Amino acid sequence: MTEAELPEPPAGGGTKKAAELAFDTRVEMYRQVGVDLFRLPGFNEETVLRLLSETGRDLSRWPSEKHFASWLSLCPGTKKTGGKVISSRTQPNRNRAAEALRRAAVSAGRTETELGAYFRRKKAQKGPAGAVTATAHKLAKLYYVLVKEQQEYAPESAANYEAKQQQRTLQKLTKQAAALGYELRAVASGT
């Protein structure tokens, strides 16, 4: 993909900032990184510039996306004793890259993409703070793979994500029912 073929960024409802940059950030970041990071939901100029300034283009100092997310303190620090989980809070830190990813996660939560659906599902499970951390963790892993592997981001719609999630839930319930000696059967929804 050449710079001229870069698709338009997703429509955002933002206002112009007082300190606008004098160059086209999308084109320059594409030239520097080789991937259009602005296609990730929630990513804007500030997020991309902050991540690149904090991590650099070379992500080889982190062996995997899990190490990268851990460095950002976006992984739960599960503490166990006697086989029982006593705490699973993330480590507190002042990492500016993690803060940028958290802001991007909040923004991504308002979109109609798979990350937006993921955010809403996690918000129902863990509350707003847990959803922000979980979505920021997912964004960190996506960022790592896109930059390191030079892959383009292929977004999925929220409807497709929800359908896959429903299919996973159905498979899980079918397996649990079979383990208990029951069989699940679909009921006609004609009421």
Predicted regions and their residues:
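A detector of single, family-specific signature residues
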Residues: 1-191
